Amino acid sequence: MKYDYLVVGSGLYGAIFAHEAKAKGKSVLVVDKRPNIAGNVYTEKQEGINVHMYGAHIFHTNDKRVWNYITQFAEFNRFTNSPVANYKGELYSMPFNMYTFNKMWGVVTPEEATTKIEEQKKEITGEPKNLEEQAISLVGRDIYEKLVKGYTEKQWGRDCKELPAFIIKRLPVRLTFDNNYFNALYQGIPIGGYTKMVENLLDGIEVRLNTDYLEHKAELDALADKVVYTGPIDAYFGFKLGTLEYRSVRFENETLDIPNFQGNAAVNYTDRETPWTRIIEHKWFEFGKDEDGNDLPKTIISREYSSEWKAGDEPYYPVNDEKNGQLYAKYKELADKETGVIFGGRLGEYKYYDMDTTIASVLNMCEKELS
């Protein structure tokens, strides 16, 4: 059988395109080299808990079109992201808000907090030369030392004085007691997990798992008129211009025979000495309950470690610096010349996408491609 579209990758971008193409009467084949669908939003049920296998995914958006679209495929709960920062046993509220400033300095009013921050920002004069100076110019020395420095150095594997200032364009400072990390109109987690949501998107569509497109490119290309490719753009071209860099993350998952490990979905460890950047306790994404509303007796945690990416590792975050940007531009030129191939998604476009921007991007592409 000849398909209208071969979709490479069953993450959000690939699954949504496949769904929309099928809805327009097109025949679609989806292939994925992993043994499961859903890409990095894949959740796996263990001990009654939906475990985010590739790191915490909290859906948030201000885009009503995106929200109305994705909620057709899952009911979302009311989870809001309120991480806690642990600095050597001192707990602080994230984002930086009045709870943070009260704990740090004993200030009680927004005016007192503003005065304290302004006082500390004065340390930096002129244009910040590196990330350390940039952070201090935004939030002052105390918050930088306890809540920014160690965490950032673990994430990037480099001293803050060696990192460019542009990495931290802004550090949201809130002069309220609002603990909601995202300023988003719509927020939540799909009830029953993301995998179920992607299953609904792919309903009635042929999916072949454990299928590496690049290893079987010629025979798979022959099956379809057009390809939608959501894998790494440099891999598609055999890395012939060089390798695009990513930051990677490693997870250590542990099942514990206790009902509650840390009392919150996410705790960031902001000192340099603790080797992990944060611990996720997955059950709190769904309020510690199973689908029938019963308390879950066990818990599952994931310790998250930032690591330098090397070929073969899972690519997570594109390193959008000048060098990689220029290399991507060259690959993009090659991609634009490929006939019958659409490159999309985080890896296909070498772009840091949140889930909502991925959805917006693929819906825009569908309008152009399928209308």
Predicted features along the sequence, with ranges:
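N-terminal FAD cofactor-binding segment of flavoenzymes
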Residues: 56-90
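Glycine-rich FAD pyrophosphate-binding loop
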Residues: 19-47
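Short glycine/proline- and charge-enriched loop/turn segments
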Residues: 45-53, 179-181
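N-terminal Rossmann-like FAD-binding beta1-loop-alpha1 element of flavoenzymes
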Residues: 3-30, 366
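C-terminal catalytic lobe of FAD-dependent flavoproteins
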Residues: 314-371
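Active-site/ligand-binding neighborhood in enzyme catalytic cores
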Residues: 85-92, 98-226, 230, 235-237
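Short, solvent-exposed loop/turn segments at secondary-structure junctions
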Residues: 12-13, 35-36, 99, 153, ...
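Mid-domain catalytic core of redox enzymes
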Residues: 24, 214-334
